A protein has these predicted regions:
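Short, recurring structural edge motifs at helix starts
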Residues: 13-14, 129
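Hydrophobic lipid-interacting interfaces of membrane-associated proteins
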Residues: 1-4, 19-35, 44-107, 116-126, ...
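Short, solvent-exposed beta-strand/turn "edge" segments of beta-rich domains on protein surfaces
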Residues: 17-19, 133, 154
């Protein structure tokens, strides 16, 4: 009904190829003085329920079950804050949920956010680079405490990011040459690395685990891992001024590999490995 109030000429420009439905509730309080030197402060509450958005030219499926509740304190004379109580949506078999807040949204952008998402990659191939074919179901849970400076400068030394990714029925093909298959792949990421004992300049802790993983490079190399776990401490790879370094503990119940006429296997290998880059980029 609200869209019907928009002049037809404007609807054609703004909503061409877009179909939007749902129930919108808006409440706002405006307080202050409007003049050349001042703008009134606005306290707003936005609720959008039973939403549906269809954009065939951009999205392969309609966005459904779009529900959100947002509070905003907008003060252009000082700082503005946005509070996302919840923002949820589905797209076919994929889903998305976001909550948290963004302080000083017009400038510093101090973000404290929580994300939960499920992506059915079979349905989202149009968003994936053409030289990659990816299948399976990707589940992501993450929390982030970052700001605009850190994001813009890719400097996460003072950021706090924790996340878990679970990839079920993983099947990835790159350039029709490299194929990686796993029944379930788990990746845990933590920034900063709170357990950095073996790497003094460690930025992140990464844990990769799963039950079965098979990889193939053309018809030359075939390899497989069973019951694998890799726990790595990684330096700030985004800082070009810091030589890259990695320290990792690993354990597998079995490794199998073959190349041409050579075959290799090992039962229960485990240990630690370290790589340190010197200033001249030589690895040791």
């Amino acid at each position: 009904e609200l869209i019907g109030l928009i002049p037809a000429s404007m609807r054609e420009d703004l909503l061409d190829g877009i179909d939007v439905k749902g129930e919108l509730q808006l409440a706002a309080k405006v307080e202050g003085t409007y003049n050349e030197n001042s703008m009134p402060a606005v306290n707003a509450e936005i609720k959008y329920n039973k939403g549906m958005i269809s954009m065939p030219e951009m999205l392969p499926y309609s966005v459904t079950n779009f529900n959100t509740h947002i509070n905003a304190d907008i003060d252009l004379n000082d700082k503005s804050d946005v509070y996302v109580n919840y923002l949820k949506a589905n797209m076919s078999n994929s889903s998305f949920s976001l909550s948290g807040n963004i302080k000083d949204v017009m400038d510093k952008m101090y973000c404290n956010l929580k994300l939960d998402a499920t992506a059915d990659l079979d349905e989202l191939q149009s968003f994936i680079p053409e030289d990659i074919v990816a299948k399976g179901v990707l589940k992501l849970n993450a929390t982030a405490n970052v700001n605009n400076y850190q994001i813009t400068n890719m400097d996460f030394t003072d950021a706090k990011i924790n996340g878990n990714m679970q990839w079920d029925n993983m099947n990835v093909v790159y350039c029709d040459t490299i194929n990686v298959v796993a029944d379930k792949l788990n990746v845990d990421l933590s920034i900063p690395n709170s357990t950095s004992e073996d790497l003094t300049n460690s930025l992140a802790a990464v844990n990769i685990s799963g039950t079965n993983l098979d990889a193939k490079v053309a018809d030359m190399i075939v390899a497989g891992l069973k019951d694998y776990s890799i726990t790595a401490q990684v330096s700030d790879v985004l800082d070009e001024n810091i030589p890259m370094s990695v320290y990792a503990d690993y354990s597998f119940s079995r490794i199998d590999a073959s190349m041409d006429d050579m075959n290799f296997f090992a039962n229960n290998p485990h240990g630690s490995v370290a790589m340190f880059m010197e200033e001249n980029n030589d690895a040791t």
